[in-house]
From Swiss-Prot:
Pfam (any one): HATPase_c
Protein name as annotated: DNA topoisomerase 4 subunit B
DNA-binding among keywords: yes
List of residues binding ATP: Y55, N95, D122, G164, L165, H166, G167, V168, G169, A170, K397
GO molecular function: ATP binding; DNA binding; DNA topoisomerase type II (double strand cut, ATP-hydrolyzing) activity; metal ion binding
EC number: 5.6.2.2
GO biological process: chromosome segregation; DNA topological change
Lineage of producing organism: Bacteria, Pseudomonadati, Pseudomonadota, Alphaproteobacteria, Caulobacterales
Cofactor binding, note field: Binds two Mg(2+) per subunit. The magnesium ions form salt bridges with both the protein and the DNA. Can also accept other divalent metal cations, such as Mn(2+) or Ca(2+).
Length: 695
């Protein structure tokens, strides 16, 4: 499994801590100064919205301040559902955690009141309240709470390690809250400022003298954004607070909740403090389970200077962890990285090399067959790194891409793991035998699948347009579903013939959500797809019949391509939901643009990515920009480099949420037989849609 195909967090609802930008303590925002252009007489301004079909200045909407956040909350917190709601808490909590990690706070208090207000209080330095030099008449606190990208985490002077650029998070929480009350104890006084829906209700006030230090943010999410009756879940808040305490052993987090808000077994009061950090976390997670070694491999290394710190805990169990054989939960600067990244790669490499070296030392020749997947297959692992200036892949910050993190983690764990193995030969031998057994089982499964796949291929009447892969193993085999012969031709040239098969589909894909059973049965394209997969639909689906490990939908990076992908996902959801639950369905992410200047070229997946490249990689330059009209336009080498090469591509795994009823409702609304449901959905969700829509 490639790093880009990683399964999301397996730690239950604790993955609600998934990161989005977070909140500051020193504002440093440089207003952009544009050069003064030569005056050009403007045309008469439009005073009213233009007529249908026309496009004028009246159609241009300028969103100022925090209005973009309220208009498009999904861009900042990933939606407006329960998970997104709890992101607000994660943002505020991350700010206080950064104060603790920096050594300025020891205690954090989390409180959910009867009126639905949630407060997070710390005993850190307190947000700065002095006037901001770049914003006359505004305090630094007001800038922090009302200006996107204002924060004290850019220069590294206020924080060496932080969970993100928290000026984004504080202002986003403010924008999406009905009311926010920020109390700061600093400079000998208690200060208070109140906000509503992103706007201050008045200037900052000096309430009373006080010797205390710290910050308290008390807020209530806005029903206009999240819907009536959407409230914080005490159980989820409790788990999130407890997880943060595990991640930094130097902090104490106090939890309290009004009893009227609790409808389960969540304690109304609790104090979280874990002196052993992740080792305590793992002990709680593995309570009652039989482990291969009596003690887990756990530790913490701090490196002076630029490197940072790493903490880890790992154990192995023969029975697995509930629905999963194993899990790996990772964090960077206390923020979850559910998609993994370089710190996980270093962790896996250190364990694998250490165990193989131990096998060689003991003369165990079977140790050569061990892979990293064998080592972590039935392991419960936790890893947390603290590094300066972390780099993440994508805007969601769920995958760490800092290359130094891999080297740092691997180097830090190498000697401690060797020492742990050598200090208890009996336990080390038990672990080695256990991992070798996993490796031998893996090789046996591969051999059985090769025989099974070869036998199934001989029995099946595969569609003639399928360009099948040459290999007989199911593991690693991939089926790319592409649109039309043109794209299919490019894909066939770009593929790895041993592992990658290509199935071009012609014509419009049938919408199975609105089609009758007879139409579905008679549809040749979908029949060919079923034949290629080898598995049957509905209750007759058997995963062992599936001829490929990954089914990858590869369509053009435009609206038409997205429509075809939606139809195919609907097909799999309605006819083979177990294929999705098994983690076999993926979306390829081909680029939409190619930017080139001199000898350098970059690919952009969408307009936002293109603008980002223009502002960074090609800043001050005028690159040649080409737009791909379709996959068939791309050279085979380009398609391979950007979309099909497992070492370079990015895949999006299609998953189903825990509560699948919402998915069924959405599929029926958008893809079903009732156009009035689609029309109502568009009316409620497409705020800027003013043009005629083809329903």
């Amino acid at each position: 499994m490639s790093s880009s195909d990683k399964i999301p967090s397996l730690f239950g609802d604790d993955d609600a801590l998934a990161p989005v930008p977070a909140a500051p303590f020193k504002a440093s925002v440089e207003p952009r100064v544009e050069p003064t252009p030569r005056p050009i007489p403007p045309p008469p301004p439009s005073k009213t919205a233009s007529a249908p079909g026309e496009y004028s200045a009246a159609d241009i909407e300028v969103l100022e301040g925090l209005e973009p956040v309220r208009k498009r909350p999904g861009m900042y917190i990933g939606g407006t559902d329960e998970r997104a709601l709890h992101h607000l808490f994660a943002e505020v909590l991350d700010n206080s955690m950064d104060e603790a990690v920096a050594g300025f706070a020891k205690t954090i208090e989390v409180k959910l009141d009867a009126d639905g207000f949630l407060s997070v209080k710390d005993d850190g330095r307190g947000m700065p309240v002095d006037p901001h030099p770049k914003y006359p008449g505004k305090s630094a606190l007001e800038v922090i709470m009302t200006v996107l990208h204002a924060g004290g985490k850019f220069t590294g002077k206020a924080y060496e390690t932080s969970g993100g650029l928290h000026g984004v998070g504080a202002s986003v929480v403010n924008a999406l809250s009905e009311r926010v009350e920020v109390t700061v104890w600093r400079d000998g006084f208690e200060h208070l400022q109140v906000f509503s829906r992103g706007k201050p209700l008045g200037p900052i006030q000096q309430v009373a003298p006080s010797k205390k230090k710290g910050t308290m943010v008390r807020f209530k999410p806005d029903d206009e954004i999240f819907g009536e009756g959407t409230n914080f879940k005490p159980a989820r808040l409790y788990r999130m607070a407890r997880s943060k305490a595990y991640l930094f052993r130097g902090v104490q987090i106090k939890w309290s909740c009004d009893p009227s808000r609790i409808h389960d077994q969540t304690p109304p009061e609790a104090t979280f403090h874990f002196p052993n950090g992740l080792a305590d976390f793992l002990a709680e997670r593995t309570k009652g389970l039989t482990t291969i070694t009596p003690e887990s491999f756990a530790g913490r290394i701090e490196r002076q200077g630029e490197a940072g710190a790493v903490e880890w805990a790992v154990t192995w169990t023969p029975q697995g962890f509930g629905e999963h054989d194993g899990f790996m939960q990772s964090y960077c600067n206390t923020v979850p990285t559910p998609e993994g990244g370089t710190h996980e790669s270093g962790f896996r490499a250190a364990l694998t090399r250490g165990l193989k070296a131990y096998a060689e030392l003991k003369g165990e020749k079977r140790g050569t067959i061990i892979t990293a997947d064998d080592v972590v297959a039935q392991a419960g692992a936790l890893i947390s790194v603290f590094i300066k200036n972390p780099e993440f892949q994508g805007q969601t910050k769920e995958k760490l891409s800092t290359s130094e993190a891999q080297r740092f983690v691997e180097a830090s764990l190498r000697d401690p793991f060797d020492l742990w193995l050598s200090s208890s030969p009996k336990n080390a031998q038990a672990l080695l035998e256990f991992v070798i057994e996993r490796a031998e089982e893996r090789l046996k499964r591969r051999k059985d699948k090769e025989v099974s796949r070869a036998s199934a291929t001989r029995k099946l009447r595969l569609p003639g347009k399928l360009a099948d892969c040459a290999g007989s193993a199911v593991d690693g085999a991939e089926l790319f579903i592409v649109e039309g012969d043109s794209a299919g031709g490019s894909a066939k040239q770009a593929r790895d013939r041993k592992y990658q098969a290509i199935l071009p589909l012609r014509g419009k894909i049938l919408n199975v959500a609105s089609a009758s059973g007879e139409k579905f049965t008679a549809n040749k394209e979908l029949s060919d797809l079923m034949l290629a997969l080898g598995a049957q639909a509905g209750a007759k689906y058997r995963e062992e019949d599936l001829r490929y490990e990954r089914i990858i939908i590869m369509t053009d990076a435009d609206v038409d391509g997205a429509h075809i992908a939606s139809l195919l996902i609907t097909f799999f959801y309605r006819t083979m939901p177990e294929l999705i639950r098994g983690g076999h369905l993926f979306l390829a992410l081909p680029p939409l643009y190619r930017l080139a200047h001199g000898g350098k070229s970059e690919y952009a997946r969408d307009d936002a990515h293109k603008e980002e490249l223009l502002a960074t990689v090609f800043k001050g330059k005028k690159p040649e920009i080409g737009r791909f009209k379709g996959l068939g336009e791309m050279m085979a080498s380009q398609l391979k480099e950007t979309t099909m090469d497992p070492k370079k591509r990015t895949l999006a795994r299609v998953t189903l949420p825990r509560h699948e009823e919402s998915v069924e409702d959405l599929v029926e609304t958008l893809m079903g037989r009732k156009p009035e449901l689609r029309f109502r959905f568009i009316q409620e969700n497409a705020e800027f849609a003013s043009a005629d829509l083809d329903l």
